[in-house]
């Protein structure tokens, strides 16, 4: 739909629409990404300005309560107790609403990969990028949008945060890339399952995560990956931090290789040492090719 956009712009386009063809088709390929976002989201007559709430009204009787829960998740409440605190709803109501949102695939339940039976390691997130982008940025912009200052609001308040917003979405894209290429012989093992690991690093006694974990469940091999959607190249420190985490997933799995996924490439040190350290470097351009 937007063939002339850069890989970065295509990724952002995907990240704010959830990849829904209907929404992407509304992007005018003759306009810049900024103009398209401003026209569709930050404009009183833009199609996306009221789309998420309209969908909730169509789907649920008490749409306002569902909107509150979706908003809480979009803004960082990933566990039931956190959602309860942000919405002031009872636990039973939160569980009921979450179940309905799961059924409609607006949200998804995420487990720490290799620890799916650990009920303490469960997080909720928005599976739909359009809902995520809208609930993260539009409610605070309503006053500006209604007096036709939406584009200025977007350029000053939202555009500088797009890379941060894309962080979680880029991780999902990288996991999808891993699965899509499972049988391409690109990697040193056949990835049959991909996810994210999160929990406590016992050595450092701190919370941490591994952005990408690809498992070859037949050979008990794993690929560990780190993802950065930033304007700076990935460096030695980020690679070393990834390699330090290889003992955190289930001990059945032996690490076959490491992956670094990057919007802005890699430092010379990383490129010079990648082969020796068993690291595969994957710039965003390779993901689109």
Residue ranges and their predicted role:
Residues 2-55:
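Amphipathic alpha-helical "lid/sensor" segments that cap RecA-like P-loop NTPase cores
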Residues 5-6, 77-79, 251-256:
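Short, surface-exposed connector motifs at secondary-structure boundaries
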Residues 33-85:
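Winged-helix-like regulatory helical subdomains adjacent to P-loop NTPase cores
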Residues 53-56, 80-81, 116-117, 153-165:
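Short hinge/gating elements
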Residues 88-104:
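Short amphipathic alpha-helical interaction segments
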Residues 102-113:
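A short, conserved structural fragment
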Residues 111-123:
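Short, Lys/Arg-rich nucleic-acid/phosphate-binding segment
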Residues 122-289:
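A cross-kingdom feature that marks ATP-driven nucleic-acid transaction machinery
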């Amino acid at each position: 739909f937007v063939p002339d956009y850069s890989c970065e712009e295509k990724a952002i386009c995907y990240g704010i629409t959830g990849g829904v063809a209907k929404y992407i088709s509304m992007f005018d390929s003759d306009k810049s990404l900024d103009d398209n976002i401003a026209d569709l989201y930050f404009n009183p007559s833009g199609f996306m300005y009221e789309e998420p709430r309209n969908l909730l009204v169509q789907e649920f009787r008490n749409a306002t309560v569902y909107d509150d829960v979706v908003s809480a998740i979009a803004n960082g409440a990933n566990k039931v107790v956190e959602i309860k605190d942000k919405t002031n709803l009872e636990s039973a109501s939160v569980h009921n609403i979450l179940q309905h949102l799961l059924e409609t695939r607006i949200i998804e339940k995420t487990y720490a990969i290799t620890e799916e039976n650990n009920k303490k390691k469960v997080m909720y997130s928005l599976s739909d990028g359009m809902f995520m982008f809208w609930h993260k940025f539009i409610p605070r912009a309503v006053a500006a949008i209604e007096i036709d200052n939406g584009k200025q609001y977007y350029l000053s308040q939202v555009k500088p945060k797009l890379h941060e917003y894309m962080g979680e979405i880029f991780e999902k894209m990288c996991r999808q890339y891993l699965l899509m290429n499972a049988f391409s012989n690109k990697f040193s093992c056949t990835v049959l399952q991909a996810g994210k690991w999160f929990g406590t690093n016992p050595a450092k006694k701190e919370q941490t995560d591994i952005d990408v974990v690809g498992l070859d469940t037949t050979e008990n091999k794993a690929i560990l990956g780190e993802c950065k959607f930033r304007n700076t190249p990935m460096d030695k420190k980020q690679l070393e931090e990834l390699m330090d985490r290889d003992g955190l997933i289930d001990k059945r799995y032996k690490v076959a290789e490491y992956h670094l996924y990057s919007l802005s490439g890699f430092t010379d040190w990383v490129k010079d040492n990648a082969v020796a350290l068993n690291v595969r470097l994957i710039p965003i351009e390779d993901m689109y090719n």
